[in-house]
Amino acid sequence: MTQMTDAKSGITTEEMKFVAKEEGMDVETLKNLIAKGYVVIPKNVNRNTKPVGIGDNLRTKVNVNLGTSPDFIDIACELKKVEISNKYGADAIMDLSTGGNLPEIRKEIIKNTNLPIGTVPIYEVGADAKAKYGRVIDMDEDLIFNVIERQAKEGVDFMTLHCGITKQTVSVLNNDPRKMGVVSRGGAFLTAYIMYHDKENPLYKEFDYLLELLKEHDVTLSLGDGMRPGCLQDNTDRAQIQELITLGELVDKCREKGVQVMVEGPGHVPYNNIEANMKIQKTVCKNAPFYVLGPIVTDLAPGYDHITAAIGGTLAAVSGANFLCYVTPAEHVRLMKEDDVKEGLIASKIAAQAADVAKGHELAWKLEKKMADARMKHDWKKQFEIALDSDKPRKMREEIPSKDEKACSVCGDYCALLMVEELGKR
């Protein structure tokens, strides 16, 4: 049984009750959304995961990516990133490790958080194939599905799988070349496999078998966008749309089998094209939850891509995206460090909150009203408690204090609020 099959059968699970309470929503309404496939609750039956709802009519959620690379392997560092994710309000974590003992790293990450954990299994497949055969492209079907099954048994809650990269998709890419080709790592593995062997993508060819594996453990399928644009010039091209059409067809198959599914979206999109991309996806994929990376709205800001992504993420969430994958200042430059994780997470949470306010979400507005009340009362402690990041503003206030404990050092004696407040008392 999965959350979706239970919902279709009219069964109210404990996870549904928890999410409904968290979202301030009637549980029957939530159950109906899950039954239709408009909301997912990624929770593997083998793990005690905190239930998190992702989809329409819910708060916008934020994911943190972390993980090792062949150039930097430090489990302690990754666990520190997990700690930061827990502390600053991530809704999910993806382990994208490609260096070191991948099962051991994943085990430690899972052990140190109760947040939903996602992976991209093809990374481990590629690492295993390289170790065994010397090349990633020599991976085979057995290796692919063995890794997926092993990760499902370990408790992974959602998996990014690039099932929409097919021989047809690759043909479209070759006939309509783009500036930066394939920038998705998992997408590149499978594109290279198809081109070298002239074989169909096993994840697409054996999709029914894949669904059986995922359904057994109630792993949510996150359909990866292997043809996402890697620069603004490539946005919304034929390869991207061809893959999206295939993903829409696969969403239908998931729903027929009762497998929870969400769809991943583009990474580099000009601001004026974001709304159209969201509406195309929501239409083609019939309101499946949409998971976007950014989108990044300019390619000119390496070192500041947490900002470019937050700008794009706000509009994306207002226009239909349900799940924002954070982007850190290190994007396009190096592996993220602990501080990068915090900066990226807070930036994406700002985008999510701004979007939820724009959509009129009641819980988002309650927080805004609480902050306004605290500021009006000069209650600095309360302001910091409500803030998305309590530590930074508290430290900043201590650095240059005001002589008046109610004011701040910007205005001091000339505080507008205090001035009008004093006049009102006379």
UniProtKB/Swiss-Prot annotation:
It is an enzyme of class 4 (lyase). Zn(2+) binds at H268, H332. Its cofactor is [4Fe-4S] cluster. Substrate binds at N65, M94, Y123, H162, S184, R185, G186, D225, G226, M227, R228, E264, Y291. Pfam families: ThiC_Rad_SAM. Binds 1 [4Fe-4S] cluster per subunit. The cluster is coordinated with 3 cysteines and an exchangeable S-adenosyl-L-methionine. It catalyses: 5-amino-1-(5-phospho-beta-D-ribosyl)imidazole + S-adenosyl-L-methionine = 4-amino-2-methyl-5-(phosphooxymethyl)pyrimidine + CO + 5'-deoxyadenosine + formate + L-methionine + 3 H(+). One of its GO terms (biological process) is thiamine biosynthetic process. Its EC number is 4.1.99.17. [4Fe-4S] cluster binds at C408, C411, C415. Belongs to the ThiC family. This is Phosphomethylpyrimidine synthase. It comes from Methanococcus maripaludis (strain C6 / ATCC BAA-1332). The lineage of its organism: Archaea, Methanobacteriati, Methanobacteriota, Methanomada group, Methanococci. The gene is thiC.
